[in-house]
Amino acid sequence: MKKLQKQRRSDFLLLIVAAIILIGAILVSLAMQNGMNTAGEKNVSMWLTTPDPANRLTQQAPIPWRIDDSNEAAASADTLTVEIRPNIRYQTMEGFGAAVSGSSAYLMNHGMSANQRDQLLNDLFTAGGIQLSYIRHTIGASDYSVDEQGQPSSYTYDDVATGKDYELNHFSIAKDRDVIDVLKQILRRNQDLRIMGTPWTAPPWMKYGEQIYNGWYLDYTDPRVYQAYADYFVRYIQAFANEGVPIQAISIQNEPEFTTSKYPSMSMGAVEQAKFIKQYLGPALSRNDLSTHIIAFDHNWDTGSEYAKTVLGDEQARSYTHGTAFHCYQGEPTAMTDVHDAFPDKPVYMTECSGGAWSPGFGDDLSWDMSKLIIGAPRNWSQNVLFWNIALDPSGGPTNGGCTNCRGVVTIDPLSGAVTKNVEYYAIGHASKFVRPGAVRIDSTHYSGSIETVAYRNPDGTLVLIAANTGENTKTFKVRQGNQVFKSTLPSKSAATFQWEPTTS
């Protein structure tokens, strides 16, 4: 009898132990599902894009943190280690996005059904999509502007048949109705959206030669023209505000060192731009209590450093100028660091870059976009990253005399309204979906031509690491914060975003 009681007691204890083990396993499993590892630390969330279509900003299994074992570290000395140093801080980010050109707005408003447009805007601007947070648009016509029938159209906000209009009596934003409508739809999804406006040209009657094309500069023989152009910017900002579209920033001239006879353009040298800012535009914004930022240059990396230094080197112009903008088509992003180092209190911005049919393929495109723009621009102090057209049709249009093989962030088929998300969508999404406006760039180890990185601390405290393997072979690497590490492997020409709560060590 006693033996039977002992046996039952032993069996009961075994059942209790088994139950405890089972409960512990369940708790561990639940913790893992909820982003916790067995040490009580949050796991790392990961999203991956590769040349394989199966991975397009696709969430991966959570990655656990581990204590960094010195013996293991010595044994794997050949493994790249990315150090995250949250206490070393750089610039504050304003956002990531693209441009709503006239062509983009036309396709969204006239090439899709209302349901298709809603889905696209949700994919672009809400938390369920990639949460773009910064938009550039053209003040008047550009190389991507069309009329109500989708035909090429060149115009400004103050066109007159003959003579001058110094009082801007013919000022009207009516021809940008599609753009305004799309911006309103975006703002309903993201009220914190930042919007930047850029003209391709002044009204022809203000220009020497009075042509919308050919890049003729402002008529310097008539001082009234400079004042009228400053007032033109004021009227534009006020008119868009009256439509419920606030303008946070303006650049003075798109690509001021490039002119063409194919679409609206205008030359503006650095000395002339400084003069216009300090004598006319800056005072005009101030008189009208407008806080819109003035951004200088807005052209390529290769010549931007000297142009920006000329404008910012003028003390009066500098007092009105918020920062400098750059494009990607020539030069290297290090030009932005050059300007930052010369004027560290003046932000730099990456405001235009277009993909296109000239590119070799998805993997190479992704690798370049990540290296030069998504990672390279912020590592060189840019406070935003913007692609060019947010949407184009399958032929790279509709165009107004510009590039015939450029590509939008998405492609809209106007015959069906179907949307194709291009490599630019996934590249910008690796940042915009996770790095919120107000995030601060923090220090991270960077291996050029291999595992390239940029890291941030969001306003809510979460940490984000964006990494790209720009090399030709698969790479395994460790990420270390304090005495904790996690390990990851990236195929060649791939990108990943990692997000986690700060570690407690």
Stretches with model-predicted labels:
Residues 40-69, 73-82, 195-197, 231-249, ...:
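Substrate-binding and catalytic surfaces of secreted/luminal carbohydrate-active proteins
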Residues 5-18:
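N-terminal Sec-pathway targeting helices
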Residues 1-3:
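Short, low-complexity, Lys/Arg-enriched N-terminal segments of secretory-pathway carbohydrate enzymes
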Residues 32, 36-40:
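Acidic, histidine-bearing metal-coordination/catalytic regions of metal-dependent phosphoesterases
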Residues 21-31:
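Hydrophobic alpha-helical membrane-insertion segments, chiefly the h-region
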Residues 56-247, 279:
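N-terminal catalytic cores of secreted or lumenal carbohydrate-active enzymes
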Residues 8, 27, 492-493:
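Intrinsically disordered, low-complexity segments
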